[in-house]
Regions:
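General beta-strand structural signal in soluble alpha/beta enzymes
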Residues: 13, 37-40, 96, 119-130
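Conserved anion/nucleotide-ligand pocket segment
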Residues: 128-159
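N-terminal Rossmann-fold NAD(P) dinucleotide-binding loop
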Residues: 21
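Rossmann-fold NAD(P) dinucleotide-binding segment
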Residues: 62-69, 73, 77-100
Length: 159
């Protein structure tokens, strides 16, 4: 059962044009994740792995439609602004892989997420995976390795 991410989850990548953002996006795409847009200020009109890049989260949503989850591949000092931008645009799930995010920034993000009935996974999170369906964040690598490490569970009729 996929709870936070599945094959239909529409994912946005903040920081998609950076080295880590492009690498993480490629891993997610190879696993089957439905990455529909990326955001890097000042880079509108570009594309990464065929994914359109926009200047803001709001602009991306206006162009591609609703987004279910954002992954913030941005440096720790930029995490707070990226997360708040995603939350204010209406995204309810935000994955934050960055480490060393200042504690005050974390408190601000958590308070904002609670007020907006949203969820932050991280900071310092490897991300999410629904085996055989989709992944978000750093849970990536060679598809064969992921499939060996993360397998769908067996359905039990008594549950």
């Amino acid at each position: 059962m996929a709870i936070l991410i599945n094959e239909k989850t529409r994912v946005l990548v903040q920081g998609i044009t950076g080295r880590t953002g492009a690498f993480g996006t490629r891993a997610m795409l190879e696993y089957g994740t439905k990455v529909v847009a990326g955001v890097t200020p000042g880079r509108r009109g570009e594309s990464v792995w065929g994914i359109p890049v926009f200047n803001t989260v709001k602009e991306a949503i206006e162009e591609v439609g609703p987004i279910d989850l954002s992954v913030t591949f941005v440096p720790a000092p930029q995490v707070k602004d990226a997360v708040i931008e995603a939350l204010e645009a209406g995204i309810k799930n935000v994955v934050v892989p960055a480490e060393r995010v200042p504690l005050h920034d974390i408190l601000v993000m958590v308070s904002k997420a609670k007020a907006m009935n949203a969820r932050i996974i991280g900071p310092g999170s490897l991300g999410l995976i629904s085996p055989g369906k989709a992944s978000a964040g750093w849970i990536g690598g060679a598809r064969e390795l992921i499939e060996e490490s993360f397998r769908p569970g067996k359905r039990r009729s008594h549950l």
